[in-house]
Every structure is written in structure tokens, then in C-alpha cells.
Amino acid sequence: GATERAGFGSADLRGEFPSLVTCDISGYGAEGPYRDVPAYDFLVQCESGVASVTGTSEEAARVGVSVCDLTAGLNAYGSILEAIITRMSSGYGDGIHVSLFDGMADWMNVARLHQQNYGRPPERMGLSHSLIAPYGAYPVGGGGNIVIAIQNDREWGRFASNVLGDKLLVSDSRFINNAARVKNRGEMDAIIKNVFEKYNLSNLCKILLDERIAFGRLNDALALSQHPQLRTIPLKLPDGEVLEIIAPPSRFDSGDSVLGPVPSLGEHSEQIRREFK
């Protein structure tokens, strides 16, 4: 690419500075038949098969956030830290290659094994799960949706008896175990919806919490902004404007990281140049 032509390629830099750790991020990697194929997040979601397991039974869908870009960054971050730790004992840096495609292919391991073992791809079911029931979003009275994911028969027993209010459902042959519940998903979902629609969102959340049933609310960006668990921090832009953004996810006992202001274009260019003189 342009950096190599200018003499700033990763290999060139490590030749001059053997302890340097470099990381190249590309769409499909430095080798292979797709190495020169242009790549965007959406395109890689489709090429990797991620879009094929996302969406409804009628149509595949793009994941709503740029998962390829984000995953590539996280993979690069972890690999750079690994190389830095290795350098502490070896004294040498390393060259790292991360691609959007490899990151998503790694995510598809379970789907690929499903294809190999069952001879068919995982069934696409929106917010539901092809192998677990009940699992999905259910509307409640007054608006909103509750999502549940019953993981075992013991949890189903508490849910059926204490939330749905019908102990007979526990021993009902249609719902006696997960396989039966998956087979009779339609009948089971109808029962759940009928009960859930009798409650408003806050009342049902309290009942589920009291009964130790795992649940969530189907939130949008506005609801996330108002979430009581959400942490935010101020961030100063180059023009002096201050935005409230979501805080970094990792927290340390020694104290949370303090973010400095967003740098202006070229603000640290000279400082970086001096490091390589």
C-alpha cells in the first residue's frame, strides 16, 4: 500500500527498529486469493456468513453495529499486548496481521460445526433460538417487550408455576423438557403471550426478578440512554464542545481510566516523528 511505497511499511520499520511491534489491519489478510479484494464491514458480514445467521426466517440481516470493524480492533489490541509481553523476555518486537474476515470467521465456528454435524446451516429465527424454548421476545400490556431465555427444566418449572401461574404446565407432555417445548413452541408461545399481556412492563419485570427468572427488556438507543446501569463520561472535542459518551467497559480497582480530549488533526504528528528520528 501507500505506506510501503513511502518506506513506512511494517517490515521496513521493524528492520530499522527490531523491538517495534507493528499491526496491519486489512479486509481479508495479507495472503490468499482475496488479499486485494476491497472490503467494508457489511460486505465482510455477508462473505463470512454472519449475515446468514442473523435476521428472520424470511430474510438475512446485517448486524446493526459494525461488528467486523470493532472485532478487528479488539483482535489487534489483544495481539499487540501479547507481542509487547513477549518482547519483555525476548527483546524483539513482531509483525501482526489482523483481518476483518478472519475475525468474523472465528465467530462462525459454532455455525460451521452445526453445518458439518447436521448437514444444514443453523435455522435463522430472529430473536428466537432454534434449539431452546422458550427463548425470545414477548409483548407486554401497555407496550414494550420482555425477552426470556429459559435454560433448563428447573427454571421452566419456576417460570410455569410462579409466573405463568399454571403448575400443570410443568408436567404437561407438550412442555415436559426442552425438546418438547421446541417441538410445541407455537402453543407454548401463545400461553406466554396471553399471560404477559396482562402485565405492564415494570410489574412483569418485578415478578420475573422475584422468581429469579433471567430476563431483559427489548431496548432501543433511547432506552439505553436512560438505563440505570449505564455509565457515561464527558468527552471534549477539538472545538471545545463537550459530549457525553458511554464510558469504557473495563473498570479497574485502582481507578477508572481518564480520557483526555479528542486530538485535532495532526496535533501529535511532530511528537510521533521525533520518536522515530
Regions found by a protein language model. Give the residues of each.
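Flexible, small-/acidic-enriched active-site or ligand-binding loops
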Residues: 235-277
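Alpha-helical scaffold segments in soluble metabolic enzymes
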Residues: 76-83, 158, 162, 271
